[in-house]
Regions:
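Class I SAM-dependent methyltransferase Rossmann-like catalytic core
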Residues: 1-16
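Well-ordered, non-membrane alpha-helical segments in soluble/globular domains
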Residues: 4-8, 116-124, 182-201
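Short amphipathic alpha-helix with an adjacent loop that forms part of the alpha/beta core around
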Residues: 12-15, 75, 148-155
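Conserved proline-anchored active-site loop of SAM-dependent methyltransferases
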Residues: 22-36, 48-53, 154-174
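Conserved S-adenosyl-L-methionine
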Residues: 38-45
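Class I S-adenosyl-L-methionine-dependent methyltransferase module
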Residues: 45-137, 167-179, 183-186
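Active-site segment flanking the S-adenosylmethionine/decSAM binding pocket
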Residues: 141-194
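Conserved Class I SAM-dependent methyltransferase catalytic core
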Residues: 193-234
Length: 234
């Protein structure tokens, strides 16, 4: 996407100007952390966080933290199986998809996941290994976005790039397994972009760090001051 070219230039410039810490709250699949490494940040300069189970399994695997700390439980899987990151991701993917089993595509994919379970797990392990080879050395915590941001607001050498949900309870809806997989979820508030983006900008208005935030909105209605924009539809 064109915004990634812009961000890459921005990140490269920030490094030249003395920024030594990169934060990715709402990390998702760690797209910004990958971009930070591509742009010149070292993994040990990167901090990522999220409140979702999926991202936390990935984050713990990449950073070498034991999954015991996440207290994972999943219908149809033993607790011991879930100590393996690739199996835990497989369980999440399977149970997340199962909520849509009434639709042909999802039903057929679930059958494929069952029949080729070991192949799917092997593929997930390979993905995790690739991510670890790039991001190994970074830090990850299951942590609320607001708490993570507050830690570095007064750090003039920190760069934050946040990409919060684009609709209310976006993460919750996407990552929902209907209770079939549970974990030691951190405390956090539901993010509603209608009010949350305004709160975000108000919170960082006097920050000493450099803060960038994704926002999806109509021209003239943004919470922050746009420095890059592109037309897009969902």
């Amino acid at each position: 996407p064109s915004e990634q070219k812009f961000l890459k230039t921005l990140i490269e410039s920030s490094i030249k100007n003395g920024y030594t810490k990169f934060l990715e709250p709402c990390a998702g699949a760690f797209a910004m952390s990958h971009l930070a490494v591509q742009s010149g940040f070292k993994p040990n300069q990167i901090e990522a966080s999220d409140v979702s189970m999926f991202t936390s399994i990935m984050g713990y695997a990449i950073t070498g933290q034991p999954l015991e700390e996440l207290c994972l439980h999943a219908k149809g899987f033993s607790d011991e199986e879930l100590l393996d990151p690739a199996t835990a991701l497989y369980a999440w993917k399977y149970l997340n998809m199962a909520k849509n089993a009434g639709k042909d595509y999802f039903y057929n994919y679930l059958i494929d996941m069952e029949q080729r379970r070991e192949e799917h797990i092997k593929g997930l392990k390979e993905q995790l290994d690739r991510a670890k080879s790039i991001l190994g050395g970074m830090s990850y915590r299951a942590l609320d976005m607001w708490k993570h941001i507050d830690e570095v607001l007064d750090d003039p050498h920190a760069l934050i790039i946040a990409n919060p949900p684009t609709y209310a309870a976006g993460f919750e809806k996407y990552y929902d397994t209907k209770g079939n997989m549970t974990w030691k979820e951190p405390e956090y508030g539901i993010f509603d972009p209608e009010t949350g983006l305004i709160e975000f900008m108000d919170r960082v208005k006097d920050a000493k760090c450099l803060v960038m935030c994704y926002e999806e909105n109509i021209p003239g209605a943004t919470a922050g001051v746009p420095v890059f924009a592109r037309y897009g539809v969902r």
